[in-house]
Amino acid sequence: RGSILIDGMPTAGKKTYQVNRMGVARTFQNIRLFKELSVIDNIKVGLHESLRYDLASSLLRLPNYWKEEKKCTERALELLDIFHMADFANVPAGSLPYGAQRRLEIMRALATSPKLLLLDEPAAGMNPSETAELTETIRRIRDDFNIAVLLIEHDMSLVMGICEGIAVLNFGRIIAKGTPDEIRNNPQVIEAYLGK
């Protein structure tokens, strides 16, 4: 039991969009892209909260609408460029390889400009090459974007390779907290994962 605070504000009872406005974005274990939409349009979905035009501007295609849409497209292209996916901007998201779809989902979450990025088993179903690319993506988010990343993951090499602090759960109970070296040498962790 406990509570989650973002900048001192409780998240309990908040709707998803309210938590997002507090600066939290997340991805899910199962990829949730708009597979028929282009890669760039998937990222633009994450930017919708930042658009500053009203319904009339949108319906009538007034100048403010075009100005905001241009900014949105530029930001989406910037993210694609940063993560080396600009060549896929107009490709349907569903046609991307699995690892690229996962990175796209993370980029869409980043488009919301979060303070905290929650990643739920991002390496699930990935091959070693895709996991290596994902590791670099997460490291870059942490270092270059200065965003806190909360990672839920079973791939221990990924966790040990990028996390500064680790909490290990066994059947829903925290059995250890510490640095990668502390966790690697913790007898309770070794017993839980390798058995006696």
Question: What is each of the regions a protein language model found here?
Answer:
Residues 1-196:
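Glycine-rich phosphate-binding loops of nucleotide-dependent enzymes
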